[in-house]
Structure formats: C-alpha cells, structure tokens
Amino acid sequence: MSVHALRELFKHKGEKNYEVFSMEDFIGRLESEIGLNDSVVSQGRSLISSISHENFGTVQATDIQDAAAIYNKMQMLVNDYGFERVSSSDPQVRAREERVRENQITAATMAAIACADETKYIRALRGITKAKASNEDHVKVVQHQFNGPAGGIQVFENGVGLENYNEKSQRDFRVVTIGYNLAASRQDEFAERIYPTTVINPIEGGVVQVLPYIAVMKDVYHEVSGVKMDNEEVNMVEAYRDPSILDDESIALIPALDPAGSNADFFVDPALVPPYTIKNEQNLTITTAPLKANVRLDLMGNSNANLLIQRGMLEVSDTIDPAGRLKNLFVLLGGKVVKFKVDRLPRAVFQPDLVGDTRNAVIRFDSDDLVVSGDTTFIDGSADGVINDLKTAKLSLRLSVGFGGTISLSKGDSKFGATDTYVDKVLNEDGQVMDNADPAVKAILDQLTDLAVIGFELDTRFTNTNRRQRGHLLQTRALQFRHPIPMHAPVTLPMDTMTDEGPGEVVKALTVNTNIRNSNNAVKRMLNYLAQLREVVHNGYNRPKFGIIEGALSAVMRPTYRYKELDLEKVIDTIKSKDRWDDVCAAILNCVKAELFPAHRDSNIEAAFRVISGNQDETPMYLFCSDKEIANYLMTKGDDRTLGAYLKYDIVSTNNQLFDGKLVVIPTRAVQQENDILSWGQFFYVSTVIADLPITRGGHQVTREIAAIPFNLHVNNIPFALEFKITGFQKVMGETQFNGKLADLKP
C-alpha cells in the first residue's frame, strides 16, 4: 500500500470533505462527546422538566437561550458531516428545502433534550396521546379516523403499549435516538408537499392549531314579546361570496298593512296585486303591498315604525333617510298588472326640495324606455292577453311614464302619483318603429284603454343615528383545534444489529422503514379524506361548519369535492402522431380547468385565505398530485401558466400504486410557514426515544429488540379537492388513432 493510501486511510475524520451526509461519522462524533459537560445531551438537562408544556421554549428566557444553544450546536455538527445543503435557485423551492432541513435539526435537538432524562420524556409522550377535554366552545378536541377505503393506519391511541418503556434499556441508545430523529423527521417529496412536517414537543393533550375567526352579529328578536332572543353570528368569510350578509335591513321602512284593514285604502287593490309577507332581521313579520298612486298618506304611520320603536331599534325622533329612491312601479295593462324595476334608472333617487320645507325630498322620475314584449310576464306569472298578442305579432311596446311626488323626511307626510302614462312607440322584431295605424298594432293598442300607474314601492330607511354609529358589530375569537398524537406500531431490529453493524447502520435501517411508512400513510390519509369529502358533499352539505367534515378551515369555507373520469381514447381524435402529445396534454388540462375554475369560485377559498392570513393579496396555490405517468402530461408546451395568468400551480407525483391513474388537485400555500393552517395538510412529528424493549413474537416468545416507536399524525386542514381518474394513455399514445377511426366507419 502506498504512503498516500495510508494517509487517506488514517486521515482524521474532521479533515474529510463531505459531499453527502455521513450518518456513521455524525454518530461517531456524538459518541465521542456524549459524556462531556458541553455535549448536546448534557445541555438538555435544564429543559427536560418543561418540555411537555405548551409554551415550551417561548416564555422563559433561559429556556429560549438553552434550546437555541443546543439547536446551534446540532446545526454545526450536522454541517460538519455534509448534512443536506439548500442549493436550488428557485426562491420557493429554497424556502421549502430550508424548512425541511430546519425541521430535521429541530427533531434531533428535541431528541437530544429527551436523552438528558428519558424517563421524564417518556412520561411526556404518554400525555400527548391522550385527549384533553375542554368545556370551552372555541376549543375543539379532534378525534381522527385512521381507516378508510384506501386502507388503515395501525396506531395505538391513549398511550396503549407505552408500558414497555418502563423497563430500563440495557444499552445506551442515546446517539441512535438523535440520529434516528434527524433522519426520520421527513417524508418523501410527495408527502412533504401535501403534508409539510412540523416538529412539536410532546404537549399534554396533543398539538393545538389556532384559526382566527371573525363573524358579524345579527340581532334577532322574539316576534311577540320583543325580548332579545340571541345574537346570530355569520361567518365573515361568507360575506366575500354573499354581499347581502353585510346588508343592514334592520331599519328599513316597510309599509305595513293593518290586519284589521284600517289602512287598506292606502294600498293597491288586493285583487290586482295580492299582499305578501316578509320577515326582517329582527324576526318581525310584516304584511305589505304596493302603495296606491295619487293618494296622500303618512308614510311613517303606515309602516313598521311602531314595531321598531317597541323593540328599541328606533326612537320617536328618528326621521326618514334622505338617501331613498323609487324602487318599483306597477302598471295596469289590459286588465292585469306588470311590475317594472326602476331603482337603477336615472332620476329615481330622492332629491332635496329646493322650494319650501328643507326637510322635504322630491322625486321627479320619467322614462320612455319601459319595455313590454312577448317575454314580459304579469305579476301572477301569466303571459296571456296583450302579452301573448305581442309575442304572436313579434312586437314590443315602449311606455312613457312620468311619476313624482314629495315626502316630509321628519313627518312622513307624502303624496306620489303619475303625471302621464302612454305608449310612446311600437317596435317590430328588427327594432323599427311601427305605424300605429297598422292593423296588428292597432289591435294591441285598443286593448290598453286602462293603461295607468296604479302603485309604487320605495326603497327607504330610517336615519336612526345610534344604529348608524354602531355599524357592523363583529365577534372575533381564536378557534383552537387540539389533536392528540397517536403512537404507531414499533419498528424493530434484532439486538445483535447494534454489535455487528454499529449504531450508524441501526439508524439507517430504522429510518428507511419509518420514512417509507410515513410517506405511505400520507397517501392513505389523503385518499381516505377524499372519500370523506365525497360523502359529505354528495349528501348536499355546502355551508361552513366544523364537525361535519375534518379540517380546521371547514369552520369558515364551503366543503368542495368534484370527481371526473376522463377516457382519453374517447376525446382524442388526432390524425397526426406529432400532434398527439399536445392533444393529450390539452385534454387533461381542459378537463381540470372545467372543474377547478367554478370550484375555486363556489368554495369561497380565496376569501378564506385572505381573512385567515390578514393579507388581501393572499391566494391559494393549486398542487397537482398524480402518479408518475400523468405527471409527464401536466405542462402546456411553451407556456407554464397551466391554469392561466390568475391561479398559481405546482406539480408533485408519487409511485405509490394507490395513486395509479389518479390526478388530485388541492389548494395550499405556496410557501408554508411553521404549523401553517393554510397548508392543505400537516404532518406533526414528535421526537421519540430508541430503546431495547421486550417484544412478543408469535404470542409466546419474548425477545429484546431495538425499537423505535413513532409518534406522528397527518392532519387535513382544507376541505377542498378535485379528483380525476384518467385512462387510455396506452391506446392513445401507443396505437394509431386515425386507423381506428377509419375502422369505425367501415360498413
């Protein structure tokens, strides 16, 4: 052997240039320092007693300093031995890689603290598996289901099986514990993108997620007594989708018919326009109808004002808001009534009365564009008589209507009426003006001898200064979701592995199994959650409510699930082989877009992201999750904006056979934060302790084996998923479609 070879053989480990991480050398370094006072294990003694507390590492200054010192030393150690370095130039990829790296170092740091007093740490592990009951409405203890159509996950809840940890280990596995948690606290790329890892300390009762919740309060009253019944709260996220949630109709002025009929003369004849009943936000039931034109009346005295005063919503000094308008006109036409909505037409709004009382408002409405055609219906829903004749003759009428009046805002005294109503012109289907002498036109006009405005409705409110100053009353609180972390089936090795192969090989063997199992569990949890979503949505449930479906965001957004099957052989008809690739890509993406775009809108997910994050520019990124075959077709040639310019996306794939032929599209955050509730899912990892434990084999034989007992949980946050089953790749890409089409045409 040459001198150079001997030098390389005996070269000090610290002088090596590590291109990849060496677990053996890292473990060797830990072993050489394990007994020193400044080792990572020795430094953790001061922290072990408080590690199970929810505020661990965030309150006591000494805890923060000690934990940071251990983390920094652990980071230095792994860096010395070539631990994975972030190299990507893409900022988002770099952020994800750095987050995974930090989580692994954090898991190793927690393991080092655990090794300072394994007995106390194991006691804390027992606490994290047990549900911690709460009587508070805003604290939800989540009980997870670990079985489903995609298979079950073997877990032991409530600390079952931890009794074996009571026995003293016969070997020192502290360095193995640190190395194992460093390597085992990550999943494969597919699982990590869907369920990014968050390392947590063994908190009693499990990990806690916090969701900011904002609601607008709606006052509700008993109809008879006026005693307040409750404050109904409406999720503010829903207001993005449904703006009527923020409408305040509590002080609307509604003309009210007296059940005894004492004020019936102020309303349109019920034989022409039947009265109808409405219920306002205060649970008050009011019977109303259009007001009669050309009649003087006290608008306040014939309204719901007295009901509102009785319930404390108004005072007797409240006046009518000057920001009112004419809402609807009711026109008699050939013996029946047509309603015209005019509130958005010019001159329909109240204007100040410049002559006389300054507390008066006036309306001077006129229009030559009220249309009556064959598509018009009377208020009873019919379209007979003159309407049917217009449809048969393919004609339409343009009515000229003048309507006006004055109202005292302080007293309610008012009078409104029509100044003139007539047919301005008759048009044919080409928009040409017809001669009134035309027989068809004359026959229709002869039926309109009763043409007149007989009634109207106003859109008015009371001023109610106190109510205005109050505005929208909001309710804010932090919803807490507590998840007990289950114990999984142990991963074991024969005891002699430690002696024969060394601690480095023990760590490798245990972590290979753990990594694969955690990654497979992620696929199972995802597919089982999709089945749960499918059942809930197909049963017709489409409103936010936690408990109906798993996921913290179910409290603020509508559960969404859509399923589509795509047989490429039925949709691809390319003649030229060179075009087939592009057509397959386009067919898949068009299928996704047809489902995703309306689902994005209807689910209200964008509003949920903005309210929860507090960032008005926050939007979800859509993750395309597929098998290895489909992933190759998910890019549009020459354009990486697969979802257009508005929605962001990314692609991740797995070779797990449970995902064969599947494409699942889910929303998530582009760059997840620690314990990020806006990630579609999360993987909570708790550092565990490696020991040699008695394991029963075959029901009788008991052997001592090296055991790693994982504590972790995949949690689903966002109740939104689109699932596609795609088939026909082999037929489309591997066979000539043109010949197939010709064969179908042969007699």
UniProtKB/Swiss-Prot annotation:
Keyword terms of this UniProt record: Capsid protein, Virion
Presence of the UniProt keyword Secreted in the record: no
PTM comment text: Cleaved by the capsid maturation protease during capsid maturation.
Residues annotated as site: Cleavage: E24, D25, E54, N55, E84, R85, E97, E98, E118, T119, E136, D137, E163, N164
GO cellular component assignments: viral capsid
Cellular localization per UniProt: Virion
Disulfide bonds, paired cysteine numbers: none
Description of how the protein assembles with itself and partners: Homohexmer.
Function (record text): Capsid protein self-assembles to form an icosahedral capsid with a T=27 symmetry, about 120 nm in diameter, and consisting of 1560 capsid proteins. The capsid encapsulates the genomic DNA. The 12 pentameric vertices of the capsid are occupied by other proteins.
UniProt protein name: Major capsid protein
Species assigned in the record: Pseudomonas phage phiKZ
